[in-house]
Curated annotation (Swiss-Prot):
InterPro entries: Nucleotide-bd_a/b_plait_sf (IPR012677), Ribosomal_uL23-like (IPR013025), Ribosomal_uL23/eL15/eS24_sf (IPR012678). Belongs to the universal ribosomal protein uL23 family. This is Large ribosomal subunit protein uL23. Keywords: Ribonucleoprotein, Ribosomal protein, RNA-binding, rRNA-binding. One of the early assembly proteins it binds 23S rRNA. One of the proteins that surrounds the polypeptide exit tunnel on the outside of the ribosome. Forms the main docking site for trigger factor binding to the ribosome. It holds the Pfam family Ribosomal_L23. SUPFAM superfamilies: Ribosomal proteins S24e, L23 and L15e. GO terms for biological process: translation. GO terms for cellular component: ribonucleoprotein complex; ribosome. The keyword Ribosomal protein applies. Part of the 50S ribosomal subunit. Contacts protein L29, and trigger factor when it is bound to the ribosome. HAMAP family: Ribosomal_uL23_B.
Length: 111
């Protein structure tokens, strides 16, 4: 197995990712009718060649002190997006990356 920190690069923090975490924690933030999830979900940026079993093992190894158990891993590749730099004269691209949404067993969380 690779080093867990080579597989999982960092925690992915966006408004959507925070809303997904908030739905499972049961607080009032981001709660709509019928939008409550039972199991906590967290989003991470992972290595491009990482598989779902590798991601699950790495998350459990990194958060072993908290005793988390991974229930399910969903992955997706985010494509590079075109950007414009300096008043639209020079064009570039953002970097693409692989994102993993990790579902923990009910009652486990990293927060």
């Amino acid at each position: 197995m690779k080093d867990p920190y080579d597989v999982v690069k960092r925690h992915y923090v966006t408004e959507k990712a925070k809303m997904l975490e908030g739905l499972s924690l049961g607080d009032g933030e981001g709660k709509k009718k019928g939008s409550f999830c039972k199991d906590p979900k967290y989003t991470f940026i992972v290595a491009g060649d990482a598989t779902k079993p590798m991601i699950a093992e790495a998350i459990e190894a990194i958060y072993s002190a908290k005793g988390v158990k991974v229930k399910k891993v969903n992955t997706m590749c985010v494509k590079p997006q075109p950007t414009r730099i300096f008043r639209g004269r020079r064009k570039g691209r953002t970097a693409g990356f692989k994102k993993a949404i990790v579902t923990f067993v009910d009652g486990h969380s990293i927060g």
